A protein has these predicted regions:
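C-terminal motif of bacterial Sec signal peptides marking the signal peptidase cleavage site
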Residues: 16-20
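Bacterial N-terminal signal peptides that target proteins for export
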Residues: 1-8
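Mature, structured domains of secreted/extracytosolic soluble proteins
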Residues: 21-234
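Alpha-helical transmembrane segments
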Residues: 11-15
C-alpha cells in the first residue's frame, strides 16, 4: 500500500509533463518551405503600365521564355508611345501587321548581353542579340552618353535601372530600328565630316540612299572604310 502511494504522484507528474509537451506541439505552426520569388525581365514588363505593347510584342515573337531565362540581359524597353510611333511611321495599323521575323529581330536589337546599369554604359558600340540576314552576325548598336543615354541617335533612356533577377531594364522613348551603314555614320559624331562629304549638294550620286539599301536588295551588302574626323584632318 505504501509503495502504491509513492507511485501515484510519479504517474501524475509524468502525465502532466506529457500533456504539456503535447500542448506545445499542438501550438506549433506547420513547416512551410520558403518559396523563392522571381522577378524576371518579363515580370518587370508585365508589371509596367507603359510596357503593355512590348509584352504583346514579346508574346507574338515568342521571346517570353528567352527573356525569362537566366541571362543576364540588358533590355532597352520601348514604351507604348514608342511602339505607336513605330507602327505609324512604318505603315502598320497594329502590332499584328508586323511580320513575325521582322518583329523578332527588331526586339532582339533592344537586348544586350550582361547587366549594364546606366553608369556602366559608355560612348561606343555594343553587340545586340539581333542578327544580320547576310551572315547571321550580331548587329551593333551605338551608345552615346554625351547628353544622357542615346542609342543609334534615335532613342533615349527615359527611365533607367529597373532591376530584374536576370538583368536590368531601361525604358526608351523610341523603337530602335535595324541599323544600316548610314545609321552609324549619322549617329556617331566622329563621322560628321564623312556625312557632310556624302551629302554635299553638288554630288550626282545619292550616297545616303545607296548606303541605306537593305541587305538582300542590290547593291547591298556593303563594307565601308569610314574615315573619322581626325582622318580628314578637320
Amino acid at each position: 500500500m505504501k509503495n502504491l502511494l509513492k507511485i501515484i504522484p510519479i504517474l501524475l507528474i509524468s502525465l502532466t509533463t506529457l500533456q504539456s509537451c503535447n500542448d506545445d506541439t499542438d501550438n506549433e505552426l506547420p513547416y512551410e518551405p520558403e518559396v523563392p520569388t522571381t522577378n524576371s525581365i518579363v515580370d518587370v514588363a508585365v508589371g509596367a503600365e507603359n510596357l503593355t505593347t512590348l509584352v504583346a510584342a514579346l508574346q507574338k515573337a515568342d521571346l517570353v521564355t528567352t527573356l525569362a531565362s537566366q541571362g543576364p540581359f540588358t533590355v532597352l524597353a520601348p514604351s507604348n508611345d514608342a511602339f505607336n510611333t513605330f507602327l505609324s511611321d512604318n505603315g502598320f495599323s497594329s502590332l499584328e501587321d508586323v511580320p513575325v521575323d521582322v518583329l523578332t529581330n527588331i526586339l532582339l536589337n533592344h537586348v544586350i548581353g550582361g547587366r549594364l546599369a546606366s553608369t556602366d554604359l559608355t560612348t561606343g558600340y555594343a553587340s545586340t542579340f539581333a542578327t544580320t540576314s547576310a551572315s547571321d552576325a550580331s548587329m551593333s548598336i551605338f551608345i552615346d552618353t554625351s547628353n544622357g543615354v542615346r542609342f543609334n541617335g534615335v532613342s533615349s533612356v527615359t527611365d533607367a535601372n529597373i532591376e530584374a533577377d536576370n538583368g536590368i531594364v531601361h525604358i526608351v522613348d523610341a523603337v530602335i530600328g535595324l541599323p544600316s551603314v548610314v545609321t552609324f555614320a549619322v549617329a556617331d559624331p566622329t563621322f560628321s565630316t564623312l556625312v557632310a562629304a556624302l551629302t554635299r549638294n553638288d554630288l550626282t550620286t545619292d550616297f545616303v540612299g545607296v548606303l541605306s539599301t537593305a541587305t538582300g536588295t542590290s547593291p547591298a551588302p556593303f563594307t565601308v572604310f569610314a574615315p573619322t574626323n581626325d582622318a580628314f584632318g578637320l
